[in-house]
Curated annotation (Swiss-Prot):
Detected in antisera from mice immunized with killed bacteria but not live bacteria. Cattle naturally infected with M.paratuberculosis all have antisera that recognize this protein. The gene is enc2. It is found in: Encapsulin nanocompartment; Cell membrane. GO terms for cellular component: encapsulin nanocompartment; plasma membrane. Disulfide bonds: none annotated. Has 4 domains; an N-terminal arm not found in the type 1 subfamily, a discontinuous peripheral domain (P), an elongated loop (E) and the discontinuous axial domain (A). InterPro entries: Encap_f2a, SrpI-like. Shell component of a type 2A encapsulin nanocompartment. Forms encapsulin nanocompartments about 24 nm in diameter from 60 monomers, probably involved in sulfur metabolism. Probably encapsulates cysteine desulfurase. Transmembrane segments: none annotated. This is Type 2A encapsulin shell protein. Keywords: Cell membrane, Encapsulin nanocompartment, Membrane. It comes from Mycolicibacterium paratuberculosis (strain ATCC BAA-968 / K-10) (Mycobacterium paratuberculosis).
């Protein structure tokens, strides 16, 4: 074989690629979730970062009289509605971080994607993931911490059955909004319902499909804890008007990017590194105890054999 035969007859791929522009995606962050809880909560703006929940004391003692019959002249009862003298106050909590970006990087490498914008986008997504985690698990204001012992029940046999969810509904029977649990919990309930011959219906919300029970959607969140093969089901009633659960945020922040979220440029240091402060102010309030209930110790590792 001659050297002429070894020579390329046309431009090769490797050399040609040096003149081609690759289409590049923005950075993909696998920890981003839909964060359905944030979408489903009603969000209330607060003043000075404080939200005070005033409750009635001894509501069963409010005296009301219904007329027994025509011509009754019995005296009417005297009553008043008393309030708590030390109501609970929720203080907004911050989730913050500093984002450092070298000015040389942002100057030279911001096409086609702006480096500063992408760094801030990914940071904000991570902060919002932490927000959902705190709204569920915070020992101060999380859903699980605010469920009272009277509103917490156990499963009948470990796995989440339709009977268990029915029992949970009796705790939040005044217009319940949604169940919240880990995806493994939803799968476990689907198995139990299907095994009993009552596969749960499906509803479309926000362009996604959710299974339901008694018309109430089961919302997944990987922030609901799973320990030793067990998780929890949370049933929530939302909204101020319904005396339910509400999310809290601070409006009118400097550098506001979203409700309760601000991004502020803090300066450039002597190493030419620019710094941005990203802060989210958030909390969650339960207006009445019966707005929230928890099904505890839900087994997610039980399976059935179908014959």
């Amino acid at each position: 074989m001659t050297s002429a035969q070894n020579e390329s007859q046309a431009l090769g791929d490797l050399a040609a690629r040096q003149l081609a522009n690759a289409t590049k995606t923005v950075p993909q962050l696998s920890t981003i979730t839909p964060r359905w809880l944030l979408h489903l909560l009603n969000w209330v703006p607060v003043e000075a970062g404080i939200y005070r929940v005033n409750r009635v004391v001894n509501p069963e003692q409010v005296a009301i009289k219904a007329e027994a019959g025509a011509g009754s002249e019995e005296p009417l009862p005297q009553t008043y509605v008393d309030y708590e003298t030390s109501p609970r106050e929720y203080t907004l909590r911050s989730i913050s971080t500093l984002v450092d970006i070298h000015t040389r990087v942002s100057d030279l490498y911001s096409s086609p994607h702006d480096q500063i914008a992408q760094q801030l986008r990914l940071t904000i997504e991570t902060i919002k993931e932490r927000q959902e985690l705190e709204l569920i698990n915070s020992p101060e204001y999380g859903l699980l911490a605010q469920a009272t012992p009277e509103q917490t029940i156990q499963t009948l046999a470990g796995a989440p059955t339709p009977d268990d969810l029915d029992a949970l509904i009796t705790k939040v029977w005044k217009t319940p909004s949604f169940f919240l649990t880990h995806p493994l919990g939803i799968a476990a309930f689907g198995r139990e319902a299907t095994y009993r011959g009552v596969p749960p219906p499906v509803v479309s919300l926000f362009g996604a499909q959710f299974i339901t029970w008694r018309g109430i959607p089961l919302i997944p969140s990987d922030k609901v804890p799973v320990e030793d093969g067990k998780t929890k089901f949370i049933l929530v009633r939302t909204g101020e008007e319904r005396q339910g659960v509400v999310g809290l945020f601070q409006p009118g922040l400097v550098g506001e990017q979203a409700p309760g979220l601000s991004v502020r440029f803090t300066g450039i240091n002597q190493s030419a590194i620019a710094t941005y402060l990203v802060t989210l102010y958030t909390s969650l309030a339960v207006l009445t105890d019966d707005a929230l209930a928890v099904l505890d110790d839900v087994a997610v590792d039980q399976f059935h054999e179908y014959k």
